[in-house]
């Protein structure tokens, strides 16, 4: 009996330290909470959650596996009401699913029984490598995760098709299956001494694709910041950047665009409900990137003149924030970056639909539109003119809204437990309500919370809030809602609380 009790204590401790990163959510003083800058992006984190134990590799001592409760058989049926989706982060759930089709099948049954109508399965995490068949990118074989008291590499030794396993299980129980990809991500410099991993670290020909950042000591490739201390990053004027974490591509690089379009074409071969772009943006340096020669040539073409002092005519070394509401050149830089993301999304939508006309195409974004321009993204409709409401917005910024190229949008309404109802932007309800006029009817959207990382959620025990959360999100988004992330539902055992909230919603129809 004592042994069993000890095992459950170990599992509880591991759960407390898993899933520690989220999809992006920023600081806002109205929350009274400390929030990290984007791991950005979603469904946009982190940037990397982690999870309960499973074998790491044959040579690593194994801890007890996460217990899986048996689920009753599920008969597919027509869903009632709006969409109810759950995000399944690759790294955060790798221990459970990387080497077990059975666990995928069992949890998909439980997801269905809880009242969800679909899942969003992450198939390209921040260290790059994919969990689907691709002629473009290597298969993912490992992620960094917390194992036996420290971060270690968790390896995938099975060769079954990870994404297809979710699709098959989804069809069996009647769940929609979306696949998400961390898009403008080139690799990851992992913490706790694990070091670099991913495409740009394993392929020297790709290193020129990485963002070039404007620092106090000149222009530096993002990989040159690997492992630097917080103090050193402050000296370089990039305090919001991290010495560890995801490294980003330059979205203006034509070779990057071609590579990612081929990757998405591979993904579109699957019988999916849809494809969702995550972290389809610039990196976490405000306006500090990308200042490569590639971007300089494209920016000069965009404005129709040469920039004599690069990058000083736009931003002084180490400066990545607007001067007031932005100088004329800074506003041109803002529009240019939004155009680069817009043009990629348009091309990606066209490429995906050329392979699979019936698939839904969309993106995850943070719902905080008022400051999301720092990520180089205008996720609104081109029919919405932000310059009417926001002094930072250039007159042409509306031209680079990309919502009209999407079939669905996922917005992260990542407010804390004390900010669920409300009309302001920094509440779950407000996030969801305020998105509708921005999309201007161009695209249906779902919104939802991060129930593991936002303030008030980090220690669990918030099941009583699920009816309030469901009401705030599902009734104020045109298509429905989502939860981030499945690992948090499992960690804090929110299954019954969410089921009750969904049942209450369906009874109201």
Predicted regions and their residues:
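Aromatic-lined carbohydrate-binding/catalytic grooves of carbohydrate-active enzymes
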Residues: 116-158
């Amino acid at each position: 009996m004592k042994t069993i009790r000890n095992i459950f204590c170990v599992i509880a401790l591991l759960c407390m330290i898993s899933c520690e990163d989220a999809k992006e959510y920023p600081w806002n003083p109205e929350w009274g909470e400390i929030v990290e800058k984007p791991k950005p992006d979603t469904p946009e984190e982190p940037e990397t959650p982690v999870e309960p134990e499973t074998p790491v590799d044959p040579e690593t001592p194994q801890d007890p596996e996460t217990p899986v409760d048996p689920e009753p058989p599920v008969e597919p049926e027509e869903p009632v009401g709006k969409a109810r989706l759950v995000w399944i982060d690759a790294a955060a759930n790798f221990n459970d699913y990387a080497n077990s089709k059975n666990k995928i099948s069992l949890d998909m049954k439980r997801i269905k029984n809880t009242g969800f109508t679909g899942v969003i399965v992450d198939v390209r995490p921040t260290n790059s490598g994919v969990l689907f068949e691709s002629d473009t990118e290597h298969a993912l074989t490992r992620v960094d995760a917390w194992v036996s008291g420290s971060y270690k590499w968790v390896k995938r030794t099975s060769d079954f098709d990870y994404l297809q396993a979710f699709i098959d299980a989804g069809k069996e129980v009647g769940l929609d299956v979306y696949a998400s990809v961390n898009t403008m991500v080139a690799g990851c410099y992992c913490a706790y001494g694990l070091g670099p991993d991913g495409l740009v670290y394993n392929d020297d020909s790709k290193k020129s694709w990485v963002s070039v950042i404007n620092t106090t000591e000149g222009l530096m490739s993002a990989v040159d910041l690997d492992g630097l201390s917080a103090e050193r990053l402050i000296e370089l004027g990039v305090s919001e950047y991290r010495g560890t974490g995801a490294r980003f591509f330059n979205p203006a690089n034509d070779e990057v665009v071609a590579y990612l379009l081929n990757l998405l074409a591979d993904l579109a071969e699957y019988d999916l409900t849809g494809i969702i772009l995550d972290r389809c943006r610039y990196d976490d340096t405000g306006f500090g990137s990308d200042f490569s020669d590639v971007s300089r040539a494209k920016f000069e073409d965009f404005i129709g003149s040469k920039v004599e002092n690069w990058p000083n005519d736009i931003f002084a070394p180490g400066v990545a924030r607007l001067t007031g509401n932005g100088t004329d050149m800074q506003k041109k830089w803002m529009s240019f970056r939004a155009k680069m993301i817009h043009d990629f999304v348009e091309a990606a939508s066209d490429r995906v639909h050329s392979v699979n006309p019936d698939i839904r195409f969309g993106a995850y974004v943070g719902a905080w539109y008022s400051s999301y321009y720092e990520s180089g993204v205008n996720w609104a409709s081109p029919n919405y003119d932000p310059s009417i409401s926001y002094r930072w917005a250039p007159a042409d910024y509306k031209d680079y809204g990309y919502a009209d190229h999407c079939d669905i949008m996922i917005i992260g309404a990542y407010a804390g437990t004390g900010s669920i109802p409300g009309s302001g932007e920094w509440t779950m309800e407000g996030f969801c309500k305020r998105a509708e006029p921005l999309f201007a009817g161009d695209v249906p959207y779902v919104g939802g919370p991060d129930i593991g990382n936002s303030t008030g959620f980090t220690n669990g025990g918030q099941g009583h809030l699920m009816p309030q959360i469901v009401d705030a999100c599902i009734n104020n988004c045109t298509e429905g809602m989502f939860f981030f992330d499945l690992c948090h539902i499992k960690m804090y055992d929110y299954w019954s609380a969410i089921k009750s909230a969904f049942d209450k919603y369906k009874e109201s129809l």
